[in-house]
Structures are given as structure tokens and as C-alpha cells.
Amino acid sequence: MNLVPMVVEQTGRGERAYDIYSRLLKERIIFVTGPIEDEMASLIVAQLVFLEAEDPEKDISMYINSPGGVVTAGLSIYDTMQYIKPNVATLCLGQAASMGSLLLCAGAPGMRCALPNSRVMIHQPSGGFRGQATDIEIHAREILEIKRRLNEIFVRHTGKSLEEIESSMERDNFMIAEKARDFGIIDKVIEKRIEEK
């Protein structure tokens, strides 16, 4: 059972209760928590588009703690992050694995961060299919195409060569926050929030 805390806010019109995630959305903070699948991706995309409509000039923060998930669901979030006008700052807390790591590195340049004890994991896509030989061949070609596209995205956002990305993603590749920074997935490891003046 998931309990979502409520926050009570005093306004000129009395008290207003929000669930914590809705209140944080008001502050332009989106959470990507848990496995990335279609329903969750749809909610994240809707939040990104809503925040763009609210103020296309103001940055959005995306907090990521995800083991990864469905590639097409993750790519719908990725494409929306690239499509909307506001910069999306990404922050890894806990883990950003698989598709979670792709979303982490897709943040705006200079705005991709991780907390010191978080971990990042990159790898090639996996899948399985049963059926007729021709259908298996079609799906094998498709997963190789997905692998190529994901590699190109990591090349674009990390600055690494295609060869470096391919060899680094051959197997599960776990990184502590500092290693993820050195690899180009994030820009900095942060321990404390920097106060804006």
C-alpha cells in the first residue's frame, strides 16, 4: 500500500491540501520513481507539457530514482524533454539504471547532477521473443535498431565516441556518482542544495 503524504498550505482563501507530489509539481519538480512503463511515462510527459504551458522560460527539475524499464516508454519521456522549451535539470537520487540513466544524461547541459551515494547503470537493451522464425528475425533486427538509437543518444549527451559507448554498454556497467560524472552522464556530484540569491 502506497501512502502519499498530504501537505496543508495556508492561502488567502483558507487552507488547501495537496498530495506531496502535486505540491512539488507546483514548484516545477517532477519525480521519475520506480520502473519506467507506459502509464508512468504518460504521466511524466503530461507533467512536462503542462509545466511548459505554465511558463516556457522557467526550468523544470526531474528527480530520478529508477531501475529502468520499457525502452519505448522511456524514449517518449526523452523525446518530450528534448522537445519542450524549458531546460530540464536532472538529479539522480538512489539509482538511475538502464533507461533511467538515459533520462539522467538527457538533462540540459550543466544541469545534470547526482547525489554522492547514488549509482548509475548503463547497458544494452534486452528482450525476448517467441514465435515463427521470420518473426524472431524481425524482432532481432528491431532490437539491434533500438540498440543503435540508444547508443547514438548516449554519444550525443556524453561526448563519448560510438566505440566507447558500445564497449561500455556491452554488459551491465555500474558507476558511482563520480564515475558517472567522469563518463559524461552527469555534470556534477552535489552534496548540498545551492541557495539562490
From Swiss-Prot:
- What Gene Ontology cellular-component terms does the record carry? cytoplasm; endopeptidase Clp complex
Keywords, A to Z, come to: Cytoplasm, Hydrolase, Protease, Serine protease
Q: Which domain of life is it from?
A: Bacteria
Can you supply a Gene Ontology BP term from the record?
Answer: protein quality control for misfolded or incompletely synthesized proteins
Named from the GO MF annotations, one term is: ATP-dependent peptidase activity
Q: One Pfam match, by short name?
A: CLP_protease
EC class name: hydrolase
Q: Where in the cell is it found?
A: Cytoplasm
Give coiled-coil spans as residue ranges. none
Q: Which reaction does it catalyse?
A: Hydrolysis of proteins to small peptides in the presence of ATP and magnesium. alpha-casein is the usual test substrate. In the absence of ATP, only oligopeptides shorter than five residues are hydrolyzed (such as succinyl-Leu-Tyr-|-NHMec, and Leu-Tyr-Leu-|-Tyr-Trp, in which cleavage of the -Tyr-|-Leu- and -Tyr-|-Trp bonds also occurs)
Is Cytoplasm tagged as a keyword? yes
EC number in record? 3.4.21.92
Q: Which CDD domains match?
A: S14_ClpP_2 (cd07017)
Q: Where is the active site?
A: 98 (nucleophile), 123
SUBUNIT field? Fourteen ClpP subunits assemble into 2 heptameric rings which stack back to back to give a disk-like structure with a central cavity, resembling the structure of eukaryotic proteasomes.
Role noted for this protein: Cleaves peptides in various proteins in a process that requires ATP hydrolysis. Has a chymotrypsin-like activity. Plays a major role in the degradation of misfolded proteins.
Q: Which family does it belong to?
A: Belongs to the peptidase S14 family.
Q: What is this protein called?
A: ATP-dependent Clp protease proteolytic subunit
Gene source species: Anaplasma phagocytophilum (strain HZ)
